[in-house]
Amino acid sequence: MRVIVLGSGVIGVASAYYLARQGAEVTVLDRQSGPAEETSFGNAGQISPGYSTPWAAPGIPFKAVKWMFQHHAPLAINLDGSMWQLQWMAQMLKNCNPQSYAVNKERMMRVAEYSRDCLRELRKDTGIHYENRAKGTLQLFRKEAQMEAVQRDISVLEECGVSYELLNGNELGRVEPALANAQDKLVGGLHLPNDETGDCYLFTNALAQIAKELGVNFQFNQNVEKLIVEGDQIKGVQVNGKVLTADRYVLAFGSYSRDFLKPLDLQLPVYPVKGYSLTIPIVDPAFAPQSTVLDETYKIAITRFDQRIRVGGMAELSGFNLGLNEDRRATLQMVTQDLFPGGDMAQASFWTGLRPMTPDSTPIIGATRFKNLFLNTGHGTLGWTMACGSGKLISDIVLNHKTDISTDGLSIQRYSHAHAA
């Protein structure tokens, strides 16, 4: 079976790898010069199934209003004048209730836990290296109210069988020794020992090389113009004025998936949520993290690679604007210096990317009303966490194989206005 995968971020490359491993003849098309050159390039680096939490949560509307008046707020909303932005925010607000939160979190954790298992199996099979560590993640609380609020998430972790440890402030240094210097600022933390970390860019490029060895044909610097539709099927994809054909097509264009599907009247509710990161060389390992630390107050993740610290976070709703906002850099630097001042900030590199976010935070993985068009997009901040599982799922769906886990609630069908099948 011939399959064209559109997109070479971590989701697209993982899809191509698993399709090829199961015998498909795969071509990957991308406008960039190589894999992982956009959203997958500089993300925060954590693989955190246990922290797969919907952004649409009870209390978020109130917090969003409060954050509008804070200098180092984790969320910024810049109205871009589009009706789509307002519609997306309204859809998200509809999910900010306990019932929707529970449904969405279960879906997210189902994919994320499966994905971690797939990643471990892939690592065992291929020996792939990407500055990976398996030392867990630690969520930090600066306020007692945060310690109390985390009980809701702990109950979900217990239901899903996820190992965890709730720590007092004076116990944090046992997990992250460098935090012994910051104990007076912290009241406690939630440690998930089974989470992992790694450089998504290195992983995606290494996996692309493995996929090439399986026969995947990567075509970069391509102007992917449109899908050619005939009835309820895709007949081809127009690239640089020419039409390429396959038996089946997988769309993994991230934030750009929605506009690409507009001519097909598939209303994909994926909005670009802008995030930022700093990559900082380590000069003093004693003041650097061992794994990933999540600052609950500022919603910022600080991750250890081999000789670098990756600091990522923020959520900015400003359309497809890729400008670098120095205020966001100041927030990332402030949190890093406060907790782990072991890096050379003068040599830090500043980056931004667009996360493809759905209103319910759950990715869109599965079939459409077009018989040979499949979607693998909308992973938001969890594309790295969910990549391998999503790639394996979509490959099984495309090739009509039985999936390892339930796909209930993952396809575009959950958005009734999208007319999905």
From Swiss-Prot:
<protein>
    <recommendedName>
        <fullName>D-amino acid dehydrogenase</fullName>
        <ecNumber>1.4.99.-</ecNumber>
    </recommendedName>
</protein>
<dbReference type="Pfam" id="PF01266">
    <property type="entry name" value="DAO"/>
</dbReference>
<dbReference type="InterPro" id="IPR006076">
    <property type="entry name" value="FAD-dep_OxRdtase"/>
</dbReference>
<keyword id="KW-0274">FAD</keyword>
<feature type="binding site">
    <location>
        <begin position="3"/>
        <end position="17"/>
    </location>
    <ligand>
        <name>FAD</name>
    </ligand>
</feature>
<comment type="pathway">
    <text>Amino-acid degradation; D-alanine degradation; NH(3) and pyruvate from D-alanine: step 1/1.</text>
</comment>
<dbReference type="GO" id="GO:0005886">
    <property type="term" value="C:plasma membrane"/>
</dbReference>
<comment type="function">
    <text>Oxidative deamination of D-amino acids.</text>
</comment>
<dbReference type="GO" id="GO:0005737">
    <property type="term" value="C:cytoplasm"/>
</dbReference>
<keyword id="KW-0285">Flavoprotein</keyword>
<keyword id="KW-0560">Oxidoreductase</keyword>
<comment type="similarity">
    <text>Belongs to the DadA oxidoreductase family.</text>
</comment>
<dbReference type="InterPro" id="IPR023080">
    <property type="entry name" value="DadA"/>
</dbReference>
<dbReference type="InterPro" id="IPR036188">
    <property type="entry name" value="FAD/NAD-bd_sf"/>
</dbReference>
<dbReference type="GO" id="GO:0055130">
    <property type="term" value="P:D-alanine catabolic process"/>
</dbReference>
<dbReference type="GO" id="GO:0008718">
    <property type="term" value="F:D-amino-acid dehydrogenase activity"/>
</dbReference>
